[in-house]
Amino acid sequence: MNNGNPELITASGLKRWAETKSRDAQSYFPELIRRLLVETPEASEISIRTGDGVSLPGYDGEAIIKKPTKLLPAGLLRFEFGTNKDPNKKATEDYNKRKEKASSDEVFVFVTPRRWRNKEEWVSRRQAEGSFKEVKALDADDLELWLQLAPSAHIWISEKLDLHPRDAITLEKWWDEFSKSTDPSLPVKLFVAGRNAAARDFRSMLGGDPRLISLRSEWEDDALGFLAAVLAEQNETNFSNTSPTIIRSAEVWDRITTSPGSGVLIPLFYDPNTNCAISNGRHVVEVLDSNTARRGKDVIELPRLNRSEAVDAFRSE
């Protein structure tokens, strides 16, 4: 069920991740769920604990689902995560811990990257208790389906697990590789040096309805660096709220954009079908050089970097 693409993670890969890299899975699994929810058009009010926040009391996360999806019911969802080898035990412990204060309008959702053989039986028993409006459980096979519906998250977790998605790369990974290609490494603030107005305009456009945004620069990497700087700053150094993804072929572009979603797509190939991506909920950012005609009305001309601010960017690292 991986669309014939071995460069993308499957249910078996998620299971193997939890088994062989347990600490890594424990650290990054909440971030994966957050990215999946961000790319789910029906989801809002998303709050997922990641990093140091996972040790705090309370649910691991929550979200509001406006209408049912293939995997999630509508309503206020309360999430618990478990990456350890016995999902039945962990789910039961989490459920018992929460049911005394459960509300009849809440949905309890337990999510694991492992395969869970008796998942449906466990759900049926808990559902019959009536503590929650509904009880759901998602395992590795469910997550594989969800990833197919959330291509940017699919690419991100595949990169994390050392796979190399064909003709696609997250802007996060591109920046990590590009910034380290020099010595010293390039600071992300370098690419907004003297470009406060351009950054403000871009953030304003991104805050509106999905659209085509054109960035004109003298060189492609400069425009991508500007994108990385603005989006990282907007999301407090985390790209997950916008899921910016670079696409390098029409084949991969068409596969990603035919289903509803959200986020930012950056086509680096000739004549992408931007209308399809936009109508399905995604912003499209095209990179133009000085000789390329624009196709939309929203164009940002990147001025040359301000020398003194560029020096300050290196000094502040």
PLM regions and their residue ranges:
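Mixed-charge (Asp/Glu-Lys/Arg
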Residues: M1-E220, H283-E317
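Hydrophobic positions on the alpha1 helix immediately C-terminal to the Walker A/P-loop
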Residues: F226-L227
